[in-house]
Regions:
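Alpha-helix boundary/N-cap detector
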Residues: 6, 10-14, 44, 48, ...
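Extended amphipathic alpha-helical scaffold segments
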Residues: 37-56, 60-73
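Short alpha-helix boundary/capping elements
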Residues: 19-27, 53, 57-61, 65, ...
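Alpha-helical oligomerization segments
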Residues: 63-128
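Long amphipathic alpha-helical segments with strong coiled-coil/leucine-zipper propensity
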Residues: 1-52
Length: 128
């Protein structure tokens, strides 16, 4: 249904953004491979999971949310606001990670859905 399409779009965009963040400076496939290899050596997989799901949740914020914020703010304020929201999402996930491992979370489960909805609600509360 529509929810799985939204999930798929959000997942693809999260993957694209994470890869762009990790390897945007690579000038060849070999360099890309080296950067990724080094990244996985120096970062725990938890850091990468937090980045991925941070982008996923950011992409998952529904259209209403964006429209709601844009109506209340001008465009340049919105760009700054979206940057703050993204940081807020990453920090929320890091806090969650300290209590419950995100590695073991089934992102298709009700628990994950609650986590996403709670973060969205927190964003509305903090940024309205």
């Amino acid at each position: 249904g529509t929810a799985s399409t939204i999930d798929e779009v959000a997942a693809k965009e999260a993957t694209r953004k994470l890869l762009e963040e990790l390897v945007s400076n690579a000038e060849s496939i070999d360099e890309m491979e080296e950067i990724l290899s080094n990244k996985f050596d120096e970062s725990s997989s938890e850091d990468i999971i937090i980045q991925y799901f941070g982008y996923y949740i950011y992409e998952h914020l529904d259209k209403w949310f964006y429209e709601h914020l844009i109506k209340k703010n001008n465009q340049s304020d919105c760009n700054n606001l979206f940057r703050q929201i993204k940081d807020f999402i990453f920090e929320s996930l890091k806090d969650t990670q300290r209590v419950n491992s995100l590695q073991n979370l089934d992102w298709g489960s009700d628990e994950a859905d609650r986590l996403i909805k709670n973060i969205q609600q927190d964003i509305l509360t903090v940024f309205e």
